[in-house]
Amino acid sequence: MKRIITVIALMMSALASAFAQNGQIVDDNWLTENYTRREVMIEMRDGKHIYTAIYEPVQQYLEKLGKKAGPIMLFRTPYGLKPYGLKPGQIETEGKVEKYPGGMKGDMANYAAEGWIIVQQNVRGKFLSEGEYENMRPYVSGPDGAADTVVVKGVVQVDDATDVYDSIEWLLKNTKNNGNVGVKGVSYPGFYTTLAALSRHPAIKAASPQAPATDWFMGDDAHHNGALCLADACRFGSSFYRHRPCPSTERLGSILKIDKDLYEFYLGRPLKELDAFLGDSLRFWNQMMEHPDYDRFWKDRDPSAHLKNIKIPMLVTGGFYDAEDCYGAFRTYEMLKTMSPDCELYLAAGPWYHGGWNNRTANHLADVWYGEKSGAYYQDDVEFPFFSYYLEGKGVKPVRVNVCPSGESMRSVM
């Protein structure tokens, strides 16, 4: 059965405030009082350890909510998760912190206010996580998911599905949870959310890939309809694609030094001359140059081709003005609709830039006004109720929603 949630702009002026949906203000002081942070290095099946920050509600707050335990909300990312308390070489640290990541007070605030366990994890090879980072690592686990370990020529095969599977196994055994896991993320984390669904871990009850990086040749990030996007591929890649020689908490800076206008810089030389500026240190840049056509290299990195017989509910979210991953959201939705007829499939789309729905006060794009707090509406009335229903059995089953341009008339239909 298909369900579509379409959030089409010009939102109502009186939507959710900066409070969490249950009225709780989630800030550093509140989090320090009601949550603890544990940092651990979770061992994967090939022996590598993945940095994981676990935010858990204190028992008193759970009792206040009338709960014995809450679900786990998992967020996996290649970007920094400061503040880091764990040092390279340490396995675990625990305690309270005075300053929490912005996401805990932003798009995760509703989950924190309801006593959920919030888990933030650096993917393999990024920051403190061990192993080699591979951009858009190909899915190798197969149609049955990542439960079984595959060994080829003595080497344990891993991908982002096996890593999320192993992480959830550890989390279920080492946190006080209700046995249910949700996964969400925007952009790269959207890609990892798709791979989480492909892991087919039985504890994952719902997932929301949002602007998921999906097909890096046909429409996402580095290419748009096969045309190389230099802003993403070159400038962004000049720092992000850099090899991290050992785990560390520091962001690697750009190796590209440009002392003039970017537009002029790109127009003033053929593509091959960029190698002189980038050197030979960016493995993925070199791979892009070696694969200028839509070949197996790119197709292997598209997880949407594997979205067959997905059983868990999926909320796919995208923005009409997303310059990075507009393609990925609608491609993911299309493939799920085509290949997973039993998936309870939802779509949320609006007039947002890349990840704009995570900005609670989002109300415009440049000079185009599209209404008050559309991000807050999405978080409070679309995303959180979706996960709350499937992970805690609260609320009503999501239905198709149309928001009229004036915001004065709203109707729900099956």
Q: For the regions a protein language model found, what residue spans apply to each?
A:
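Accessory cap/linker subdomain of secreted extracellular hydrolases
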Residues: K82, E94-V97, P101-D107, A113, ...
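Alpha/beta-hydrolase-fold serine-hydrolase catalytic core, especially in secreted/extracellular enzymes
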Residues: G23-R38, E43-K48, P202, C246, ...
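Short beta-strand immediately N-terminal to the catalytic nucleophile in serine-hydrolase-like folds
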Residues: V183-G185, Q210, T317
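Alpha/beta-hydrolase fold nucleophile elbow
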Residues: T175-S187
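Glycine-rich nucleophile elbow surrounding the catalytic serine of serine-hydrolase chemistry
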Residues: G185-L195
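Cap/lid segment of the alpha/beta-hydrolase catalytic domain
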Residues: K64-K173, N359-Y370
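A short loop-to-beta-strand scaffold at the N-terminal edge of the catalytic core in hydrolase folds
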Residues: D46-K64
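Bacterial Sec-dependent N-terminal signal peptides
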Residues: M1-G23
